[in-house]
Amino acid sequence: ANSVKGEISFNTHKLYDGGTNSPFTRLTNALNKIRKGQKLSFEEEYAIESFYHEILHTKTKGWELLRPHGWGDFKRTAMETVNQFVSRHEYSKFIERLGGTARHEKSVLKDGTGYKKWVERFREVIRKAKIDENEAYKHFEDKLINGKYGDLEQEVYEYFKNKAGLKVSETEFYQALEGDQTKWDNIIKTVS
């Protein structure tokens, strides 16, 4: 997690999925393996990606404290979705800067658990509209780093409205992104 002061904290408790290591243990194991030139497991590589997600929060120029989910807007939903999407595309470069090599990029992008449903649905719009995912990544990376967090809600909607032909309101889009599968299925049908 990331605080308003830019401090990053780590969960030292075991994972809910029955995993034997905490996220902190997986991260420290990954860093030690990179230092020793050893290959990372998927879980260790994903721990680096999760850490990089938090680093991205500190890199943004337009960082602002947003209201929690469910408080009448979707600013945090948009920001976390974009941050996670960008992080999954960029974390391998971070591993390289640390001296390691990412080997699970496709799996991390597809099977990462952070904001899983939102990122899957975000990528589904990209695929269905036949938008080049690398182009979308570059577009949103720039907006994330150089724009304001609070502007991402409208930025994501306008991007998909223009590039994917969304025919629903911004509120309907975000309610479906966060909501149940039936709502989402109805939204994705409008993508062209």
Locate predicted features.
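Short, surface-exposed loop/strand segments
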Residues: 8
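Post-HExxH zinc-binding segment in Zn-dependent metallohydrolases
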Residues: 71-117
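Pan-zinc metallopeptidase signature
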Residues: 110-192
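Short pre-active-site segment immediately N-terminal to the catalytic Zn-binding motif
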Residues: 12-51, 71-74
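Active-site recognition of the HExxH zinc-binding catalytic motif
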Residues: 45-66, 80, 84, 88
